[in-house]
Amino acid sequence: MADDHIATYLNDHLAGSVVAVELMENLEAVYAGKPIADFIAKLRADIEVDVQELENLMGRLQISESRTRKASAWLTEKFTQLKLRLDDPAHGDLRLFESLEALSLGIEGKRSLWLALAAAAEVSPQLRIADYQRLRQRAEEQRDRVEAKRLEVAQRALKSERSTQAKSSSGE
């Protein structure tokens, strides 16, 4: 039973990584030629390394990848793109802000994965096969980078037109 739980948990996180990578590939295409595309490309490369770590861990634990979960994740990302496109058809700051927020939340989930596996490894010797502290630190560094960029974009995306108009009316 516990092995089934580990398989389910790891496959859920693998599916989440599919969503993240697809989202980043789309962002790179949408914002091609802009500095944010380079930021996303570097982040995607880092996350793909983590996906490989997760796949290697699953392989060592003899856990098969769930094609159903991966397909569902792919479909979820397509619906996410539709939602983002409807929210901001001009591919502006709102779309970028919401995408960065989704990535930030996903990276936090990955950090939680590594923390949970480290805790489980204390009582399950078969899980003592990865450097969870290093992986957690990588996730924290990625999250910090994404959060800094997300908050930068938030200043533009969530800027109130009323506050801008009020300042211009008052002569500021």
Regions found by a protein language model. Name each.
Residues 1-13, 36:
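Disorder-to-helix initiation segments
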Residues 10-24, 77-124:
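Acidic/histidine-rich alpha-helical segments that form the ligand environment
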Residues 11, 37-45, 69, 101, ...:
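Short, charged, amphipathic alpha-helical segments
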Residues 19-41, 63, 113-116:
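Helix-loop segments that flank and shape redox-cofactor active sites
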Residues 25-32, 55, 59-62, 83, ...:
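A structural signal for long alpha-helical coiled-coils and helix-turn connectors
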Residues 37-78:
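Conserved alpha-helical segments that form or flank metal/cofactor-binding pockets of metalloenzymes
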Residues 103-172:
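Preference for long, well-ordered alpha-helical segments
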